[in-house]
Amino acid sequence: MLRLVYDSLTGNVRHFAETLAAELHVSPMRVQDPAPTDAYLLLTYTFGSGEVPASTRRLLTTHGHLLRGVVASGSYHWGHNFARAADVIAAEYRVPVVAKLNKGGTAADRAAVRRWLLHYAESAPPFPTSCTGEPTPWNAG
């Protein structure tokens, strides 16, 4: 199972991440916690008129290579900028947008993210592989 790493300003993403984590029997991490050392799903918010929060950027700058998907919250009233942080991060790090949440999200949103996580867990390679194709102790060739 991917680690859940979240960034929250108003508490909406925190509540979504903690509720999802409880349903999955895992412990979520905040972006302010010690950085993840394994693959993770990022749950974040959209700042201003569509920006990625600075705290999320700091995590991605050093640990973006471990990112496997992104969930972002926003508000429908922002129109085309709704949860735009998800689109920006997905494009920059070439990962899927798993979900866009209106404010705190819904039970249906949690179910969709949970399904994606379970599918990812079933289809992910069983051992680490190098992003560059170089042999590692697990895929010596």
From Swiss-Prot:
The keyword Acetylation does not apply. One of its GO terms (biological process) is protein modification process. The keyword Lyase does not apply. Pfam families: Flavodoxin_NdrI. InterPro entries: Flavoprotein-like_sf, RNR_Ib_NrdI_bac, RNR_NrdI. GO terms for molecular function: FMN binding. Keywords: Plasmid. Probably involved in ribonucleotide reductase function. Belongs to the NrdI family. PANTHER family: PROTEIN NRDI (PTHR37297:SF1). This is Protein NrdI. It comes from Deinococcus radiodurans (strain ATCC 13939 / DSM 20539 / JCM 16871 / CCUG 27074 / LMG 4051 / NBRC 15346 / NCIMB 9279 / VKM B-1422 / R1).
